[in-house]
C-alpha cells in the first residue's frame, strides 16, 4: 500500500499539483508524514536511530522503502495532524511558495512563515530572521516539549531556513533545498519537539513535497536531494558534513545528523552557522570554508570539507563552504562561497586579502624603538596568544627588520602566531598600545610588507609570472581561492615569514635585499648592475648582459627555499592550501605537499606545475575533490625547478 500510495503520491500528488496535493497528499502525505514522522520520530527517540531510519528511508525512499515505511507508519502515524497541515504546506511548498508552506503548516507556520520569507527571499538575512521567527513559532508548535520546542524552533527555524535555503538551493541545484529541509526537518524537528512528529512530519513532507517537486518522486528529489546532500552536505558540510557523506549513506549520516539534531541546540547553531554558511555555502559551497567554524569538527569534517565550512565551512572552517570540500567551502566550491563563517577560509577576496585575512597568522608591527629585542617582543606579544616557534631554531617566529647600514632595528617587525584568529585578535589588541615608550601600529602582515624583508614573495619577484599577491608572500597567499577558494589560504604559510628562518637561499636578503633568491637565480656579472635574475632568464633583466656560462639552476631548490610559495590559485598554496596546514591533504592539495612546493617550480613559470605537492612529502591524501590535485604530486617533488613543461603540461587539461 505504501508503495502504491507513494507512487500515487509521487505521480498523482506530486503531479496533480500541490493543490491536489493538499487533498491527496494530505492523506497520502499524512501517512507519509506520519510514517515519516513516526519513523523518524520513533527512531528519533533514538536520534541515531531516527536518523538512521530516516536515512535508510531516504535511501530506500527513492524506492518503496519510503513508501513502505511510510505506508506503515501512516497507519500508526495517521493521527498526526501535522501531516495534514503539512500536506497543505507541502502543497504550498509544491506551489513553490515556501511562504505558502509556511503559512500552511500549522506548527511550523510561524517558522515557516519566516521561512517563507526565507524561501522567497533566499536571502541569508532572512535566514537570520528566520531563526527568530522560528524560535518563537516553534515553541508554539512544540507546546509539548517546551524546551524541545524551543530548540526545535531554533532548529526548526534553522532547519526550515535550511529549507528555505534549500529552496534557494533548491532552485539552485539540486536538492540542497530539499536537503536541508529534510535533514532539518526530520532531525531537527524531531529532536526539538518530542512531538515534532507533526513538524517533522510536516517537515518531512515538506521535504518530501520538495522531493516530489523535486525529483518528483522517482528521483525522489529527496533522495536526490540526499544525494545532493552530499553536495549539499558538502555545502553545508558544516552542519551536515557528516550528513553529506552519510547522507549518501543516509543512515549513518542521518544518525549523525540526528545526533546533531539531537543536539538541537548545537544543531541549530550548527545549522545556523551552516546556514550562514549555507548561504554562503550554498552560494558557493564555500562551506567548507568557514565550515570550520560552523560545526566544528562536523563542519570541518566535511568542510573543510565541505571544505569545512561546509557548511565545510569551517567551510567549519567551514564553511564553508561547498565545492570541494564541502562543496563547500568552495565553489561549488567557491562559487558562491561566500565567506564562511570563518571568513578567512572563504575569504577569497583579493589575492592578498585572502591570505591576510583568512590565513594570515602574522602581524606587522611598526613604531618600535631601535633597542627592541626579540625577547622583548616575544614577551609582549605573547599576551594575546601563542607566538609561533621556529622548530629548527627554537626561537619565536618574530622578525625584527634591521637597518642595513646601522644594523639596528628599523622600528618594524613581524610576529607570527599559531593561527590566524590569534593574529587578528593581536592586531585589535596591540594596535595603538604603548610599548617601551612608543605607540605601536599593528596590522596583519601583508604579503608585501612595507619593508623589503626576506619575506617570501615580498617583492614582486621580478616578474615571476604571477601577480605578487599570489606570490607566496608571507605565507603565500595561496592565491585567492583559486578554484577552490579556500584553498588559497594558508598557502604560504610556510613560505612565508622569514621568521621561519632563513629559508634556504630564498629567504635571505642577500644580494637583492628585497628580492628573494631561488635556487638557480643568478647575479648579473656586470659590476655596475649586479641584478639578481631568475634562473630562466638568459640575459640580465636590467642591463641585458648575457647570463654567465655554467650558471645552471640546481636540480632541487635549496631545502628551505620556496617553501611556501603559495601558488596562485589556492591550489598551490603553501601548505596545502585548503587545510590550514596542509594537513591531511588539504582540500585539495596534497596537504603538506603544498607546503613545500608551492609554487616552486616553475621558476618563472609561475605555474610551474604543481610544485606543490611535489615537494612535499606525501602529498597527503587527495582532497575530496581534488583527486588529481591532491595527492597528485607528493612525494619528493621533482626538481624544484619543476620541469617546467612537464607537470605544467600535465595539468593543463585539469586546471583544478
Swiss-Prot record:
Subunit structure, interactors included: Binds POLR2C, SF1, calmodulin and RNA. Interacts with PTK2B/FAK2 and TDRD3. Binds calmodulin in the presence, but not in the absence, of calcium ion. Forms a complex with REC8, PRDM9, SYCP3 and SYCP1; complex formation is dependent of phosphorylated form of REC8 and requires PRDM9 bound to hotspot DNA; EWSR1 joins PRDM9 with the chromosomal axis through REC8.
Modified residues (Omega-N-methylarginine): 471, 486, 506, 572, 596, 607, 615
GO cellular component: a single term: Cajal body
Modified residues (N6-acetyllysine): 439
Zinc finger (RanBP2-type): 518-549
GO molecular function: calmodulin binding; identical protein binding; RNA binding; transcription coregulator activity; zinc ion binding
Residues carrying Phosphoserine: 266
Domain text: EWS activation domain (EAD) functions as a potent activation domain in EFPS. EWSR1 binds POLR2C but not POLR2E or POLR2G, whereas the isolated EAD binds POLR2E and POLR2G but not POLR2C. Cis-linked RNA-binding domain (RBD) can strongly and specifically repress trans-activation by the EAD.
Similarity remark: Belongs to the RRM TET family.
Signal sequence annotation: none
Record CDD domains: RRM_EWS
Protein name as catalogued: RNA-binding protein EWS
Domain IQ residue range list: 256-285
Residue ranges, annotated region (31 X approximate tandem repeats): 8-285
Tissue distribution of the protein: Ubiquitous.
All copies of domain RRM, residue ranges: 361-447
Main subcellular localisation: nucleus
Species assigned in the record: Homo sapiens (Human)
Post-translational events: Phosphorylated; calmodulin-binding inhibits phosphorylation of Ser-266.
Biased composition (Polar residues): 143-172
GO term, biological process aspect, one: regulation of DNA-templated transcription
Pfam families given in the database record: RRM_1, Zn_ribbon_RanBP
SUPFAM superfamilies linked to this entry: Ran binding protein zinc finger-like (SSF90209), RNA-binding domain, RBD (SSF54928)
UniProt-annotated site: Breakpoint for translocation to form chimeric EWSR1/ATF1 protein, residues: 265
Region ranges (Disordered): 123-360, 448-525, 547-656
Amino acid at each position: 500500500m505504501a508503495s502504491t500510495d507513494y507512487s500515487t503520491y509521487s505521480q498523482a500528488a506530486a503531479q496533480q499539483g500541490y493543490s491536489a496535493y493538499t487533498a491527496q497528499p494530505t492523506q497520502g502525505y499524512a501517512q507519509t508524514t506520519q510514517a515519516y514522522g513516526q519513523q523518524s520520530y520513533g527512531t528519533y527517540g533514538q536520534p541515531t536511530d531516527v536518523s538512521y531510519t530516516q536515512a535508510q528511508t531516504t535511501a530506500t525512499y527513492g524506492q518503496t522503502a519510503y513508501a513502505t515505511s511510510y505506508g506503515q507508519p501512516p497507519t500508526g502515524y495517521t493521527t498526526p495532524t501535522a501531516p495534514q497541515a503539512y500536506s497543505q504546506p507541502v502543497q504550498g511548498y509544491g506551489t513553490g511558495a515556501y511562504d505558502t508552506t509556511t503559512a500552511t503548516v500549522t506548527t511550523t507556520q510561524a517558522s515557516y512563515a519566516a521561512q517563507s520569507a526565507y524561501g522567497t527571499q533566499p536571502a541569508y538575512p532572512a535566514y537570520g530572521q528566520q531563526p527568530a521567527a522560528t524560535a518563537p513559532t516553534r515553541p508554539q508548535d512544540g507546546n509539548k516539549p517546551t524546551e524541545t520546542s524551543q530548540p526545535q524552533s531554533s532548529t526548526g527555524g534553522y532547519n526550515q531556513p535550511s529549507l528555505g535555503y534549500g529552496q534557494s538551493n533548491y532552485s539552485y541545484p539540486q536538492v540542497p533545498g530539499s536537503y536541508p529541509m529534510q535533514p532539518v526537518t526530520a532531525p531537527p524537528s524531531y529532536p526539538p519537539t518530542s512531538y515534532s512528529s507533526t513538524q517533522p512530519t510536516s517537515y518531512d513532507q515538506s521535504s518530501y513535497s520538495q522531493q516530489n517537486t523535486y525529483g518528483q518522486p522517482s528521483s525522489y528529489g529527496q533522495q536526490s536531494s540526499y544525494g545532493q546532500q552530499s553536495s549539499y552536505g558538502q555545502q553545508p558540510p558544516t552542519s551536515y558534513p557528516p550528513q553529506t557523506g552519510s547522507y549518501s549513506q543516509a543512515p549513518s549520516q542521518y544518525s549523525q545528523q540526528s545526533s546533531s539534531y539531537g543536539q538541537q541546540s548545537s544543531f541549530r547553531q550548527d545549522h545556523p552557522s551552516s546556514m550562514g554558511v549555507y548561504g554562503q555555502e550554498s552560494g558557493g559551497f564555500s562551506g567548507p570554508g568557514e565550515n570550520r567554524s560552523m560545526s566544528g569538527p562536523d563542519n570541518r569534517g566535511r568542510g573543510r570539507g565541505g571544505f569545512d565550512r561546509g557548511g565545510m565551512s569551517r567551510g567549519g572552517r567551514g564553511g564553508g563552504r561547498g565545492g570541494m570540500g564541502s562543496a563547500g567551502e568552495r565553489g561549488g566550491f567557491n562559487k558562491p562561497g561566500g565567506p564562511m563563517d570563518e571568513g578567512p577560509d572563504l575569504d577569497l577576496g583579493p589575492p592578498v586579502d585572502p591570505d591576510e585575512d583568512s590565513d594570515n597568522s602574522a602581524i606587522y608591527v611598526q613604531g618600535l624603538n631601535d633597542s627592541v629585542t626579540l625577547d622583548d617582543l616575544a614577551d609582549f606579544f605573547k599576551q594575546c596568544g601563542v607566538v609561533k616557534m621556529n622548530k629548527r631554531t627554537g626561537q619565536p617566529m618574530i622578525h625584527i627588520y634591521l637597518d642595513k647600514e646601522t644594523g639596528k632595528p628599523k622600528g618594524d617587525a613581524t610576529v607570527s602566531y599559531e593561527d590566524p584568529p590569534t593574529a587578528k585578535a593581536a592586531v585589535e589588541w596591540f594596535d595603538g598600545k604603548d610599548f617601551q615608550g612608543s605607540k605601536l601600529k599593528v596590522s596583519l602582515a601583508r604579503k608585501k610588507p612595507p619593508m623589503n624583508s626576506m619575506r617570501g614573495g615580498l617583492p614582486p619577484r621580478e616578474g615571476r609570472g604571477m601577480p605578487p599577491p599570489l606570490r607566496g608572500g608571507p605565507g603565500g597567499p595561496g592565491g585567492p581561492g583559486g578554484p577552490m577558494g579556500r584553498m588559497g589560504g594558508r598557502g604560504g604559510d610556510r613560505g612565508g615569514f622569514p621568521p621561519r628562518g632563513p629559508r634556504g637561499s630564498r629567504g635571505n636578503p642577500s644580494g637583492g635585499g628585497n628580492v628573494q633568491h631561488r635556487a638557480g637565480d643568478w647575479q648579473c656579472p656586470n659590476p655596475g648592475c649586479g641584478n639578481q635574475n631568475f634562473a630562466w632568464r638568459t640575459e640580465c633583466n636590467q642591463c641585458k648582459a648575457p647570463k654567465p656560462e655554467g650558471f645552471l639552476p640546481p636540480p632541487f631548490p635549496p631545502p628551505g627555499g620556496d617553501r611556501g610559495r603559495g601558488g596562485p590559485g589556492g591550489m598551490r598554496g603553501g601548505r596545502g592550501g585548503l587545510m590550514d596546514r596542509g594537513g591531511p591533504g588539504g582540500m585539495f592539495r596534497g596537504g603538506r605537499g603544498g607546503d613545500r612546493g608551492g609554487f616552486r617550480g616553475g621558476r618563472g613559470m609561475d605555474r610551474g606545475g604543481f610544485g606543490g605537492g611535489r615537494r612535499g612529502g606525501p602529498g597527503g591524501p587527495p582532497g575530496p575533490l581534488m583527486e588529481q590535485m591532491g595527492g597528485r604530486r607528493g612525494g619528493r617533488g621533482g626538481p624544484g625547478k619543476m620541469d617546467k613543461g612537464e607537470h605544467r603540461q600535465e595539468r593543463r587539461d585539469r586546471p583544478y
